[in-house]
UniProtKB/Swiss-Prot annotation:
GO cellular component, one term: chloroplast stroma
The organism's taxonomic lineage, starting at the top: Eukaryota, Viridiplantae, Streptophyta, Embryophyta, Tracheophyta
EC annotation from Swiss-Prot or TrEMBL: 1.14.15.7
Keyword Zinc-finger included in the entry's annotation: no
Localization in the cell: Plastid, Chloroplast stroma
Name used for this protein in its record: Choline monooxygenase, chloroplastic
Binding site for Fe cation: 294, 299
Gene3D superfamilies, per database record: Naphthalene 1,2-dioxygenase Alpha Subunit, Chain A, domain 1, Rieske [2Fe-2S] iron-sulphur domain
Transit peptide feature, positions: 1-65
Catalytic reaction equation(s): choline + 2 reduced [2Fe-2S]-[ferredoxin] + O2 + 2 H(+) = betaine aldehyde hydrate + 2 oxidized [2Fe-2S]-[ferredoxin] + H2O
Similarity field: Belongs to the choline monooxygenase family.
Length: 446
């Protein structure tokens, strides 16, 4: 049972970790415009930037049509929360006002069983970002990724239909494809089984004497998939209402605000940076949600860009929106943020940021109990695409902030794992966004 502080002392992009490559011997594989790996030479190929297609600004679209195997499970889950995990969840009490509350115990960030419970109750429910519409804007394009223990595959078939599947061959469970590109079919690298981009089994090699082998029953296991503006979302949740509005289901009442900032056809993808971190995914999320409490101490250049007197944090359902005006005294005279920066953190692990001529997305990918990866994608207004110096400097400044946060978050993780720390306090009102996130976690995990 949780105690109050007065009575107790003190979780583009393809997210596949493998290189951008084909899983079959077909020669029709083409790279997508979003790279898999961090490119230290930001503008080594200017033409690739200029050829990046527009962001999709169409309304949300849910695709449920798929060729599925009735004998291949969509997801293995447990219906009940183990008592040991339940007790950990309830060590945090959301009913205690944040001014008097303790933060969740360190075991929320260090216990492997708790992380497994998070995957099941948070990441395997509702909508999760898988990638971006431009990755599969053409027929026969695909990309892959992972979400916890789930390997997924998103494809657009020859008829233009969008699909998502478990990226697992139904024969002997080999991972079917990796990376991203363009194919007419998927060939399993293990025994050569062939699947269409609609998930159907086209060929089971050498299965001439196998009895009652029905290809219709051995297609790839489907996932729900939706397009919402520039984002592709997937869901493993069988109970999800396919007729509900995607934006509202994913974000809540802030969906229109996020849409107004993210659905901009004038934006082009420019660059991806990745930051592996030796910390629990929530450590980074907590850091992001502290209303820049840490910024003056940890990010000197970034702090000089902000007018902290204008900082505003608003919590609405599954989203925390932070807005801040820019300083009149720009560091180096470089105007990166424009007049105001907009940061929308969408639970559990995704952020949309608009400032100046930029949009960035921040995706915190859980990769283990004490490991995650931050994927930062940069979009830029078309008018600035020819200004290499502006692009290089803007990306370098933001990347440096993430490098500084990486050091902080990994330090926090090490501290959480020591016997010296159990719970902390909220500094109010500046850490109200963190408290709101913890309350949502408590509600979702119990």
């Amino acid at each position: 049972m949780a105690a109050s502080a007065t009575t107790m002392l003190l979780k583009y992009p393809t997210l596949c970790a493998m290189p951008n490559s084909s899983s079959s011997s077909n020669n029709n594989d083409l790279p997508t415009s979003i790279p898999l790996n961090n490119n230290n030479n930001l503008l080594s190929n200017k033409n690739k930037i200029l050829q990046t297609p527009n962001i999709n600004t169409s309304t949300n679209k849910i695709i449920t049509k798929a060729v599925a195997s009735p004998v291949f499970p969509t997801l293995k889950t447990t219906s009940n929360t183990p008592s040991s995990i339940r007790s950990l969840v309830h060590e945090f009490d959301p009913e205690i006002p944040p001014e008097d509350a303790l933060t969740p115990p360190s075991t929320w960030y260090t216990e492997p069983a708790f992380y497994s419970h998070e995957l099941e109750r948070i990441f395997y429910k509702g909508w999760q970002v898988a990638g971006y519409s431009e990755q599969v804007k053409e027929k026969n394009q695909y990309f892959t990724g992972s979400l916890g223990n789930v390997e997924y595959l998103v494809s657009r078939d020859g008829q233009g239909e969008l699909h998502a599947f478990h990226n697992v061959c139904t024969h002997r469970a080999s991972i079917l494809a990796c990376g991203s590109g363009k194919k007419s079919c998927f060939v399993c690298p293990y025994h050569g089984w062939v699947y269409g981009l609609d998930g159907s089994l086209a060929k089971a090699s050498k299965a001439t004497e196998t009895q009652n082998l029905d290809p219709k029953e051995l297609g790839l296991a489907p996932l729900k998939v939706a397009e919402w503006g520039p984002f592709i979302l997937i869901s493993l949740d069988r109970s999800l209402d396919a007729n509900a509005d995607v934006g509202t289901e994913w974000i809540g009442k802030s969906a229109e605000d996020v849409k107004a900032h993210a659905f901009d056809p004038n934006l082009k993808f420019t660059h991806r940076s990745e930051f592996p971190m030796e910390c629990n995914w929530k450590v980074f999320c907590d850091n992001y949600l502290d209303s820049s409490y840490h910024v003056p101490y940890a990010h000197k250049y970034y702090a000089a860009e902000l007018d902290f007197d204008t900082y505003n944090t608003e919590m609405i359902e599954k989203c925390v929106i932070q807005r801040v005006g820019s300083s009149s005294n720009k560091p180096d005279g470089f105007d990166r943020l424009g007049t105001e920066a907009f940061y929308a953190f969408i639970y559990p692990n995704f952020a949309v940021e608009r400032y100046g001529t930029w949009m960035t997305t921040m995706h915190v990918v859980p990769m283990g109990q004490r490991k995650c990866k931050l994927v930062v994608d940069y979009y830029l207004e078309k008018a600035m695409l020819d200004d290499k110096a502006y692009i290089d400097k803007g990306i370098a400044i933001n990347d440096n902030v993430q490098k500084e946060d990486k050091v902080l978050c990994e330090s926090v993780q090490r501290g959480l794992e020591t016997p010296a720390y159990r719970s902390g306090r909220y500094v109010m009102p500046i850490e109200k966004g963190i408290h709101h996130f913890h309350c949502w976690l408590h509600e979702t995990l119990q």
